[in-house]
Regions:
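A conserved glycine-rich beta-strand in the N-terminal activation segment of trypsin-fold
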Residues: 24, 41-65, 84-86, 166-167
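Flexible, gly/ser-rich surface segments that form the specificity/activation loops bordering the active-site cleft
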Residues: 24-27, 109-153, 160-164, 180-191
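C-terminal cap/linker of serine protease catalytic domains
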Residues: 25-28, 178-243
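Conserved active-site neighborhood of the chymotrypsin/trypsin-like protease fold
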Residues: 57-127, 132-136, 150-153
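Single-residue signature of alpha-solenoid repeat helices
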Residues: 244, 278, 323, 356, ...
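Helix-start (N-cap) detector for alpha-helical repeat units in TPR-like alpha-solenoids
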Residues: 259-260, 291-297, 335-340, 370-372, ...
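Canonical tetratricopeptide repeat
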Residues: 264, 298, 342, 376, ...
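Register position in tetratricopeptide repeats
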Residues: 271, 305-309, 349, 383-384, ...
Length: 557
């Protein structure tokens, strides 16, 4: 009788288990087909991590944990049918919640994401991974915490089956509410709201996200064209060339009729001096582009860059004339002023300064009017040996079109005008511009700036300010012999003979063949009463080719 009761109890348990297995809602079973395994690899091809995840649409969009991607160079998934697919890009990630959204290269079975969360005490279903029949486990939601006002963070206290990290949890309708995360500190299991991960998007600046930068898998290209171009630009500036090439390919897949991706490929080819490949890329861009003006303009920029920075490497198919021709084609297709701006820059580079000046000035009467045009016109006038006052007037115009109050945008134009005023002998006015530049760029100067301003201050007889600046220059660039020699020269003017001698000796310690430093040391020694040693140093300066030395030797001997 006892045996019968035990057998009966066991039979009831088996029947109950069978009932639970068969009682699972059909949408839950369907959702199990969207589960996959995720495997990530290091740059050397070795295994980094294994996990799971779930597809949330039919186009390969998936969610899983972020930690599997941290430090990964590549990743693959295997779906519930055994099909392997590559992870092409990351859409978003959050290190704190350890979640990531990404895309694979294929069509996929999917489970929809729940738009509303579950309450405490509700039942969820944990979907395991299997090629044939997935294990499905009921899970009680023990606690729900809210974050960011609208998302749920679930806590599940019951023990879960092994090898279910990042497997999805769904509601009775088969909608994904989150995926399983084991606690590092307790026996609890957690799940971050799948809606939070699903709503992640990319922008042009996503590639600069410090979390996403830790993976070699590229960031997804935004749907917005301008944001996509920004993402492409940032990728092109990055140090990871392999990751950048992946971003370029993603951009070209999403925007095949835009020239930007081809331009970056062409630019990379040009950097490697493969001008044939660069040319082919741009010819392809022109053929495919719907906006022909943009494609021709991009090609013109590329040729111009080559002719400016790599003119020593011959490539007969390209020339400044070819660059001008492509810019002209762009303008004919769409008469935009900045296409003519490039033409003006090309004319300047060709030393056709009058034509360049005329075009720069014509552009100041368009909606492109900006300080750069007046500055470039001033440079053209300078090359034409125009009166100094005409050049200054153009630089004044550059300053006048800048927005007020001045920002760092004004910095290059202030420096240009300061140098022009200095060249004209208007030292106090020049110093005023140097000072305004100093105020705008506070904390971002280099030693060269303080040296330049010191030179102007000496000419303007502002010796104390000059001494302050040359001291700053020597502190910022202590290994530059020129600055110590200049300091020595200024100290001699101020009759600070011993300090001048020490500065000259510092300069010589950095460059033992610096004739100017020998000259200054010699003068300082003579003024300190050491005529013999001083003359020897003047003679050394003469031997090194210093042109001032002979007259000083004659003066002091």
């Amino acid at each position: 009788m006892k045996f019968f009761c035990q057998f009966g109890g066991l039979l009831s348990a088996i029947l109950l288990s069978s009932t639970l297995a068969t009682a699972q809602p059909a949408p839950v079973k369907t959702a199990a087909k969207a589960v996959f395994t995720l495997t990530t690899f290091k740059a050397d091809g070795s295994l980094l991590s294994s996990s799971h995840g779930v597809f949330i649409d039919a186009n390969g969009t998936a969610i899983s944990d972020w930690s599997s991607f941290d430090g990964a160079s590549s990743a693959v998934v295997v779906d519930a049918t055994g099909k392997k697919m590559n992870v092409t890009c990351i859409v978003g990630a959050n290190e704190i919640y350890d979640v990531a959204k990404f895309i694979v290269d294929g069509k996929t079975a999917s489970a929809p994401v729940a738009t509303s969360g579950l309450a405490e005490g509700s039942t969820a279903y944990l979907l395991g991974y299997a090629v044939k029949k997935a294990e499905i486990t009921e899970a009680r939601i023990d606690k729900v915490e809210q974050f960011m006002d609208k998302y749920s963070y679930y806590i599940i206290k019951q023990e879960m089956p092994g090898n279910t990290q990042s497997c999805p949890l769904v509601n009775v309708a088969g909608q994904v509410i989150g995926f399983l995360q084991h606690s590092q500190y307790t026996t609890d299991n957690h799940a971050t709201d799948a809606l939070y991960v699903a709503e992640m998007t990319t922008s042009g600046l996503s590639a600069n996200d410090p979390v996403l930068r830790r993976t070699g898998i590229p960031t997804a290209i935004p749907d917005d064209e301008q944001q996509a171009k920004l993402a492409l630009m940032i990728a092109g500036q990055g140090a990871d060339s392999l990751k950048a090439s992946k971003v370029i390919n993603l951009f070209m897949q999403k925007f095949p009729d835009l020239p930007d991706g081809y331009y970056l490929l062409a630019q990379n080819a040009m950097i490697g001096n493969d001008f044939d490949m660069a040319s082919k890329q741009m010819e392809t861009a022109i053929k495919k582009a719907t906006a022909k003006d943009d494609a021709h303009f991009t090609y013109a920029k590329l040729i111009y860059q080559k002719e400016v920075y790599k003119s020593d490497i011959p490539y007969p198919a390209w020339s400044l004339d070819k660059a001008y021709e492509e810019a002209q084609k762009a303008y004919e297709a769409e008469p935009l002023p900045f296409y003519q701006h490039l033409q003006a820059q090309i004319l300047y580079t060709k030393k056709e300064y009058q034509q360049a000046y005329d075009l720069f000035m014509a552009l100041t009467k368009t909606n492109l009017r900006n300080p750069e045009l007046f500055y470039e016109a001033a440079q053209s006038k300078k090359m034409l040996n125009a009166p100094q006052t005409e050049i200054l007037t153009l630089l004044d115009s550059a300053m006048s079109v800048l927005p007020q109050p001045l920002t760092t945008e004004a910095a290059p134009y202030l420096i240009a005008r300061a140098r022009q005023l200095e060249e004209m002998g208007e030292y106090r006015k020049a110093i005023a511009d140097y000072n305004r530049y100093d105020t705008l760029m506070v904390g971002r100067h280099n030693a060269e700036f303080f040296y330049q301003r010191e030179q102007c201050e000496v000419k303007g007889k502002l010796f104390q300010q000059a001494l302050n600046d040359i001291n700053l220059a020597t502190r910022m660039a202590p290994q530059e012999p020129l600055y110590h020699a200049e300091k020595s020269s200024l100290l001699l003017r101020l009759n600070m003979k011993q300090e001048a001698l020490e500065a000259a000796e510092t300069s010589l310690s950095l460059d033992p063949e610096y004739s100017e430093a020998y000259l200054l040391k010699g003068v300082a020694q003579i003024q300190l009463g050491n005529k013999k040693e001083g003359l020897l140093n003047l003679e050394k300066a003469q031997q090194l080719g210093n042109e001032q030395a002979p007259a000083l030797i004659e003066k002091y001997k």
